[in-house]
Regions:
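Conserved small/polar residues in nucleotide/adenosyl-binding loops
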Residues: 320-330
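Carbohydrate-associated surface elements
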Residues: 139, 162
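Glycosyltransferase donor-sugar binding loop
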Residues: 36-41, 198, 225-241
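A conserved, positively charged/aromatic
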Residues: 76, 100-138, 150-151
Length: 331
């Protein structure tokens, strides 16, 4: 079995993490994985865990990506994969058009994974054109059927993003060396009720909503401290600056720590008091919240999307009607 995955880059983010974990898991089972992307910091780990990486800039929303269709077609003819797996819209268009240009008898099976609630338009419709369409949650399946009704329901498979129970379990604890390094880097976190908000620094993630939560917990005498794990995309730093200004106006700057991109999120989740999901609109799945739950750590999040599906199994119904700071006080 041989699978070619198309993804914009291997820099950071949920889709990239899924591709890396798919590659690692499938490679360990003897499946040959080839990831085509514009590269990034995750490539060395991807290759170390058994996948092959081919550098090809197929993630930019520009005419230049269309010029890669011929190269992708040639790659598919040379590699002859059993499955072509499309993970994101721009690479999906390039990959789909390259796939269509192959003789029907030479085409691999076409799989798309819908990792998010994309804007509803013809551009996003490409993600519903797989011969099999993977939905990462029940709500994503509903989204596909509601907005792209031409998708045959029997083409859709619900396959939630998974975690390894060997890596994420309640008995897990970071090493003494890691803990020493963590508190040396962030001594302000010692003895605090730490609220971890992981993910890219984008408006969608709801950082502004975290400010009143921290302030109100502090007013109640709880030593709350926010730990924001993630970074803004290059050229997209203005939103982070907006959040920093709002934090300063609220007078809680000393209760926020920004770590930037980290490779040790498991250790951070297991060390923080609670993990939050404050996405402004429904999120397809919510990998970090599932990881925190598997580690036995409390999670609080807005009741929508894939995170709601997770929390419905863990959080008493009465809690869903509490305001954010009241819910956290119960935790």
């Amino acid at each position: 079995m041989k699978i070619v995955h198309l993804v914009p880059s291997m820099e950071s983010g949920g889709v990239e993490q899924v591709v890396m974990e798919l590659g690692s898991g499938l490679s360990s089972r003897g499946v040959e994985n080839i990831v085509v992307s514009g590269g990034g910091r995750l490539v060395p780990r991807l290759e170390k865990e058994g996948s092959r990486h081919i550098l090809m800039p197929i993630g930019k929303k520009s005419i230049s990506t269309l010029f890669r269709i011929g190269a992708l077609r040639a790659l598919l003819q040379a590699v002859r994969p059993d499955i072509l797996h499309l993970h994101s819209r721009v690479p999906a268009w390039a990959g789909y058009l390259a796939w269509k240009k192959l003789p029907p008898e030479d085409r691999p099976g076409l799989v798309t994974s819908v990792h998010g609630f994309y804007s509803v338009n013809r551009y996003s419709a490409i993600m519903s054109r797989g011969e099999r369409v993977i939905a990462v949650s029940n709500c994503i399946r509903d989204y596909i059927l509601d907005h792209y009704p031409s998708t045959p329901p029997d083409h859709i498979r619900i396959i939630p993003n998974a975690i390894s129970p060997d890596q994420y379990h309640p008995a897990y604890s970071p090493s003494r060396e890691w803990l020493t390094g963590w508190f040396m880097s962030y001594p302000e976190l010692k003895g605090k009720f730490t609220l971890c908000l992981p993910g890219r620094i984008t408006r969608l993630k709801g950082h502004l909503d975290l400010i009143p939560v921290v302030r109100q917990l502090l007013e109640q005498g709880i030593p709350a401290h926010a730990v924001i794990v993630g970074e803004a995309k290059k050229g997209k730093e203005e939103y982070k600056n907006e959040v920093l200004r709002a934090i300063e106006r609220s007078g809680v700057s000393q209760s926020f720590t920004w770590t930037g991109h980290r490779q040790d999120l498991r250790e951070i989740l297991s060390t923080c008091s609670v993990t939050l999901s404050l996405t402004k609109s429904p999120e397809a799945f919510g990998k970090s919240t599932l990881e925190a739950l598997a580690l036995g750590k409390p999670v609080a999040g807005y009741a929508h999307g894939g995170v709601k599906e997770q929390l419905d199994a863990f959080l008493p119904v009465s809690y869903t009607h509490l305001r954010a700071h009241e819910t956290l006080r119960h935790l």
